[in-house]
Amino acid sequence: MRPHLVIIDGMALLFRSYFASAAMGHFVRLPDGTPSNGAQGFVRHVLTAETIMKPTHLAICWDMGATTFRNEIYDGYKANRPAPPEEMLPQFAMAKQLAARIGWKNYGIAGYEADDLISVMAKKWEDDAHITIISGDKDLLQLLTPTTRIALTQKGYSQYNIYTANRFVEEYGIQPQQFAAVKAFMGDTSDGYPGVKGIGEKTALQLIQKYHSIDGVLASLSQLTPAQQRKIQADEAMLHMSYELAQLTAEAPLTADLSELMVTPYEAATFEQLAQDGYTLIAKHARSLYPFS
């Protein structure tokens, strides 16, 4: 039977968990006063995902630091994002430590984003496993294949908007690997790159549907409206740069064996110790999900 590998976008789940409870002023402090709401929420989310997705293998990928190779391409990349709140700062390391204590494998490489490591893993093992990627980031849709699906997070711990390659083609009218070209035209306000000013998602998608690639659009400029021609010619350099930024790399120097990621049964003692250390929400959640003897 083919393995089922679940790859978690750790930073996406951590931020999501933090802001879901911080908005109500719930920071769930440990006995020493350290806030833990994001880290405990992250672990609870992964535990719940395991019961839903039933993976045989599991990996968690993390961003490592504020700058990556994309900042060398464009210094405005993600420059518009605010710094994390002070209460969240100790929870980055906390989340990774909790994951390791539970037995999950953490991966992060300086200079690369979690998305890039996810990309490397998905491409490395797409012929060996069924793969589910859990994230809130639609950029990952470009990784869809017949064996890789994307589970986009929704409200709570158990709701997902699941994309397969077939669903993506039906909805977008392009292949998943063409999605980065759409992003290059429309830009990404969250990541801070503009694409072609005046070209939105609808037009960007229509261009790639009709001309298939950035080169295809540029070779057919005379067939576009005068306004579209002007916009693309004015921002052609930014268009190419945005395409570099939108593509997920397969070049990150990740060394990992699928066998290292095998999920093993949990032991009650692991969560009892976490409860003693103040992580009571995790312990309670684990007991509600798993029949410890």
Regions found by a protein language model. Give the residues of each.
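Noncatalytic, basic helical substrate-engagement surface that gates or grips nucleic-acid strands
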Residues: 2-131, 142-149, 154-158, 237-241, ...
